[in-house]
A protein has these predicted regions:
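Charged, long alpha-helical assembly modules
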Residues: 210-212
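Non-catalytic C-terminal accessory modules of carbohydrate-active enzymes
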Residues: 1-184, 193, 202-205, 214
């Protein structure tokens, strides 16, 4: 906000995205450019700014549920991290705030959690939706629970980053009457990909609950 002299960056990109950059950003009199990169267990933000004296920067990147944030530095010095304590949060979002100096580099270290990458389904204008939907995710102890919607009779394969932290996968489906049926063999995890096989049923989308048991 220009009135508060604060710039906020809250990236929530898929974990497998390449570096993201913003050029010639402007808020009030301040101008800035930034590059955000993410590796397996680190994330780096570099921001260059001009005419930004008195401006603060808020950095809130999103990581998969179960990610353990270790530490953050700004230009080599420790940077305070504030945790996002919302009980219904769909991601881990550490919050860091600092004054802009003209050239700032923030480095964040963490222990990564498994993150699911939805399959890319090419579509043309007018095509009916056929892609898998991730409605929500929750973490209960060591159980990462994924609420999915997919077409009855379809099989979907999802990439799982940091799959070495997953021990097993189980699945259940909800029928048209809202009753849940356990079908543990409908979800298969091979260490890198998760395959979910929706049983045959009526036309349209059905609901599945997949549980990834973490090590």
């Amino acid at each position: 906000s220009a009135l508060e002299k604060k710039i906020s960056f809250r990236p929530g990109f898929p974990a497998d995205w390449t570096p993201v950059s913003i050029s010639n950003g402007k808020i009030g009199e301040a101008q800035y450019s930034l590059i955000y990169t993410r590796a397996k267990d680190t994330a780096t933000l570099r921001i260059k700014s001009e005419r930004a004296a008195g401006y603060g920067f808020i950095f809130e990147p999103a990581f998969g549920l179960g990610t353990n944030i270790l530490q953050a530095t700004r230009n080599g010095a420790p940077l305070e991290i504030r945790a996002d304590d919302r009980p219904a949060a769909q991601a881990v979002r550490p919050r860091m705030e600092f004054p802009l100096s003209g050239d700032d580099t923030v480095e964040l270290r963490f222990v990564p959690a498994p993150e699911v990458i939805l399959p890319d389904v090419p579509a043309m204008t007018g095509d009916l939706s056929r892609g898998l939907r991730l409605v929500r995710s929750t973490l209960a102890g060591r159980d990462l629970q994924l609420s999915l919607e997919g077409l009855w009779g379809e099989t979907y394969t999802l990439e799982v980053l940091n799959g070495e932290r997953v021990d097993s996968a189980t699945c259940s489906f909800e029928d048209i009457y809202g009753k849940r049926h356990d079908q543990p063999l409908a979800a298969k995890f091979d260490g890198r990909t998760l395959t979910v096989e929706f049983p045959r049923g009526p036309e349209g989308y059905g609901k599945a609950e997949v549980t990834l048991k973490l090590k």
